[in-house]
Amino acid sequence: MMHLIIYAHPNKQSFNHAILQQTVQASNKLGVETVVRDLYNLNFNPVLSWEEVKAAGQGIIPSEIQFEQQLITQAKLITLIYPLWWMGFPAILKGYLDRVLTHGFAYKTDETGTVGLIHNKRMQQFITIGNNEQEYQKLGFDKSLNDCLINGLFNYCGIIDVRHQFFGDIHLIDEQARLAILERVEQITEQNLVDNE
């Protein structure tokens, strides 16, 4: 079993990085092969060019994108760790998904419509937000995010079992609350790995 972690935060001192470390620790504790794709550290190019779009239409995929697709294919659990910026993914993660989830790999179109091609995976997302979660729920943002970032993207590609956890007020909480979040991250990760065997 392989656990793929896709991480998108530029600051190695951030709380997102602590979440990453806790997720890796939980995976290692269970002896699971773990691969981390730190998009900023990799200097991943998030720009999907028109040339790349045209080439993909002919089945020509850049080797670095084929590598990312192979990791997704091999993984049983995929973890995304990122801050919610302006109601969406950080640009580098959005670009990663634009470039990697290509037609023919993530989905296809036939006479019945669009069919997702990425099956038998579980995804967990750890998302930090600047506001509190109750405020997002009150404004309906949680439903919008669920519709766009989960149903509208990953379910579309065939990943049906998508779980997400928001961690709010991230700049206001104290050390005790941060430790409680990290403990929760470890528990969720271990549970998703055990359930996925």
Question: Which residues make up each language-model segment?
Answer:
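Glycine-rich phosphate/pyrophosphate-binding loop and the adjoining helix
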Residues: 139-197
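Short, glycine-/small-residue-rich phosphate/pyrophosphate-handling segment
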Residues: 108-156
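Short, structured loop/turn "capping" segments at alpha-beta junctions
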Residues: 103, 107, 159-162
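Conserved beta-strand scaffold positions in the cores of enzyme catalytic domains, especially
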Residues: 5, 34-36, 125, 161-164
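N-terminal beta1-alpha1-beta2 submodule of the flavodoxin-like/Rossmannoid cofactor-binding fold
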Residues: 1-105, 172, 176-197
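A structural micro-motif
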Residues: 1, 32, 121, 159-160
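Structured loop/turn residues at beta-strand edges in well-structured enzyme cores
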Residues: 73, 91, 118-121, 160
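A short small-residue
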Residues: 1-3, 128-131, 162-170
